[in-house]
């Protein structure tokens, strides 16, 4: 933050679901499935914030799932048109560990009195399955000159600047297909 003079905003669509005009009503009616009914609203809020904040020159860290390639490409194009340097940074986590993390987050939010957000397993698994192919596509298209992959401990596992001829999606393929260690089970 120091190098950007505190001018950094973290944008995550999950943070905006609670501002849906019918959020309480949707929570009461659908419970854990309310997330499905606030998804479109949260996405529109995220796009509007990215548009407004980038117009004012804020540095942005945008959280996403890479469920598609269209959203990151559209965001990249908008930001580049406004003079931004854009990079793609990913955190490599096995699908099983990732889904367990969503369950833990749900429980923790419930325990501290926040409205928890349940991630449907089918949706989680769809995203986990598609991330490898979407990352491969973005790499092949040279869509982002800077791509980095980190583990949850913050260690950089891949940096396109250092290994430009290695497809980062291979890291995900390898990690997703290896046997779980005894400690992970």
Protein language model regions, located:
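ATP-dependent NMP and nucleoside kinases share a basic, alpha-helical "lid"
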Residues: 66-109
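Conserved GTP-binding G-domain of TRAFAC-class P-loop NTPases and closely related GTPase folds
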Residues: 100-185
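Short, structurally constrained coil/turn elements
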Residues: 4, 82, 141-143
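Conserved beta-strand scaffold positions in the cores of enzyme catalytic domains, especially
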Residues: 8-10, 88, 147-149
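Conserved nucleotide-sensing/catalytic segment adjacent to the nucleotide-binding pocket
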Residues: 4-77, 114-118
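A short acidic, often aromatic-flanked loop/helix-cap motif at beta-alpha or helix-coil junctions
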Residues: 17-20, 97, 154-157
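Walker A/P-loop
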Residues: 1
């Amino acid at each position: 933050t120091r190098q950007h003079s505190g001018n950094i905003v973290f944008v995550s669509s999950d943070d905006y679901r609670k501002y849906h005009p019918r959020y309480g009503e949707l929570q009461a009616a659908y419970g854990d499935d309310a997330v499905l009914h606030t998804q479109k609203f949260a996405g529109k809020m995220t796009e509007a914030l990215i548009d407004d904040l980038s117009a004012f020159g804020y540095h942005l860290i945008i959280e996403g799932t890479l469920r598609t390639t269209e959203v990151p490409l559209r965001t990249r194009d908008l930001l580049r048109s406004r003079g931004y340097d854009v990079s793609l940074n990913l955190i490599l986590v096995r699908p099983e560990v990732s889904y367990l993390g969503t369950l833990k987050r749900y429980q923790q939010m419930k325990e501290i009195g926040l409205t928890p957000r349940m991630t449907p397993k089918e949706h989680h698994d769809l995203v986990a399955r598609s991330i490898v192919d979407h990352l491969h596509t973005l790499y092949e298209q040279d869509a982002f000159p800077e791509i980095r992959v980190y583990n949850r401990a913050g260690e950089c596992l891949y940096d396109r600047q250092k290994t430009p001829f290695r497809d980062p999606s291979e890291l995900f393929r390898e990690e997703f297909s290896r046997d779980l260690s005894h400690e992970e089970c």
